[in-house]
């Protein structure tokens, strides 16, 4: 053993430059291996974090005149991969104790209406999530909200409304009251043309909790449902 050790030492002394090159190659190879392992680990961690943060989702929308029913929702919930559902409804109603925001006036009954969007969670899958709209007062509608209403700042100003005030809506055969829990503004509301009629103006978009939508519609019907799932590959 000592013989081979002595020979190795003598070789290193005689071939210094070659030995240094071999050592450098060894170091570089090991650094590359460590780097690749680190990149692979970080990539896997990043993919896991992205999947957790974004929460894969499927969007189901009404087709033609067929709305999404409560029965459809129950069927969706039966899938074990479903972790959350955000139901979205749309209807139109007449203000009963306030006036809508006036745009270009047309001799049409719908020009006196407001647009109501019902949400389970307004912080997701909405114009608030896309940052087109932002809350300037109060709080957004969530799963626990009841009789909750969020209105536009200009609509509030034109009717001298504020947080806590009651609004009444009426449809063909229903009247429902709710409480203002939030006031919002839109980044594009001032870009609307002056010729835009009241019916289409952003100021007349009102967000409500789902219990208000159900009463106005006489039943649970939805125009869109966003289904959050744990693993898309396991959906059947």
Language-model regions: role of each:
Residues 3-4, 38, 175, 224:
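Charged, alpha-helix-enriched surfaces in structured cytosolic catalytic cores
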Residues 49-58, 64-84, 91-236:
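Basic-flanked hydrophobic alpha-helices used for secretion and membrane insertion
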Residues 1-34:
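N-terminal Sec/SRP start-transfer signal
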Residues 26, 90-91:
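Conserved beta-strand edge residues that scaffold enzyme active sites
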Residues 18-20, 28-56:
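Alpha-helical transmembrane segments
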């Amino acid at each position: 053993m000592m013989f081979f050790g002595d020979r190795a030492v003598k070789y290193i002394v005689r071939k210094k430059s070659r030995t240094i090159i071999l050592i450098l190659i060894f170091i570089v190879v090991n650094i590359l291996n460590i780097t690749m392992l680190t990149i692979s680990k970080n990539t896997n961690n990043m993919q896991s974090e992205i999947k957790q943060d974004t929460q894969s989702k499927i969007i189901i929308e009404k087709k033609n005149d067929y709305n999404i029913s409560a029965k459809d929702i129950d069927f969706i919930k039966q899938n074990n991969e479903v972790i959350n559902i955000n139901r979205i409804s749309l209807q139109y109603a007449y203000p009963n104790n306030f006036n809508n925001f006036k745009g270009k006036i047309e001799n049409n009954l719908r020009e006196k209406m407001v647009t109501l969007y019902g949400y389970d969670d307004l912080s997701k899958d909405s114009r608030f999530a896309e940052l087109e709209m932002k809350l300037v007062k109060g709080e957004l509608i969530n799963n626990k909200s009841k009789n909750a209403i969020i209105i536009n700042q200009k609509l509030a100003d034109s009717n001298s409304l504020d947080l806590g005030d009651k609004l009444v809506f009426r449809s063909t055969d229903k009247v429902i009251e709710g409480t203002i829990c939030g006031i919002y503004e839109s980044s594009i509301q001032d870009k609307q043309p002056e010729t835009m009629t009241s019916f289409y103006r952003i100021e007349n978009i009102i967000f409500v909790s789902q219990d208000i939508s159900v009463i106005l519609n006489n039943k649970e019907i939805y125009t869109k449902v966003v289904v959050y799932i744990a693993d898309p590959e396991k959906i059947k």
